[in-house]
Amino acid sequence: MRKIGVKIEVNSVVGKLFTVDELMQEFNFDAVFIATGAGLPHFMNIPGENLNGVYSSNEFLTRCNLMKAYRFPEYATPINVGKKVAVVGGGNVAMDSARTALRLEAEKVYIVYRKSEKELPSRREEVEHAKQEGIEFKLLNNLVAILGDEKGYVKAIRCIKMELGEPDASGRRRPVEISNSEFDIDVDTVVIAIGQGPNPLIQSTTPDMQTNKRGNIIADEETGKTTKEGVFAGGDIVTGAATVILAMGAGKKAAKAIDEYLIEKRNK
């Protein structure tokens, strides 16, 4: 990218060190493309999520794969995976996290999911592979607390049993708690894999750029144009967590639209 003239500014947090408006007004950029993704992990806001041994799936997989934690101390990014690991969630990332934990020599790995197997959002083959590798599925169970020892480390999770209620307006059966059905599972590592969303930093400092209720930027599907003049956006920050292919496609469409926008602006 540098070879074709792209200048890369590192350690520059847009929305904190300067805003989108400042980029355009003080730094004289004619157009801005926002492609900050949807990498902010969701947590459950339950007791014990701040204990040692609790990871988001983002951090867990990033440490294991990109930062090569499995080769510590050769690489200086350790990750402490205990003998018993609970992964909370039912998507593809949850399956990836569970299978990765096994490869890091965990003796027992659980998938904790509040609905039944039929409702698992992960691909069918991911579920089958996880089962073949020995991962135990704790279905129709919901995590309500993470329990710690006197030193602040995870020692167990507390779950409550669920049952599927009547279908709602969308036809989906929502899980309902079964009263007085709480139980504990001894674990020493917990991975929360319940999805991720956009970091609100740029959106919150750009009030005239519209977002949806999830915090994603509203942009034209074909051009990436937002509701703010000269500002374009694409990828997961618009669609929510999706695929690399879709993000690349959005970038190409936006590049064409930005080029046309700049030409039109010069000719005015």
What is the role of each PLM region?
Residues 1-46, 145-158, 163-166, 189-191, ...:
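Feature captures the FAD/FMN-dependent oxidoreductase FAD-binding
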Residues 234-265:
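A conserved FAD-binding loop/helix module that cradles the flavin
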Residues 90, 113-116, 148, 236:
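Cofactor-binding loop segments of dinucleotide-utilizing enzymes, especially the Rossmann-like FAD-
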Residues 70-106:
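Rossmann-like NAD(P)H-binding beta-loop-alpha module
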Residues 50-82, 167-241:
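FAD-site-proximal beta/loop scaffold in flavoenzymes
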Residues 1-3, 8, 98-145, 268:
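Rossmann-like dinucleotide-binding cores of NAD(P)H-dependent redox enzymes
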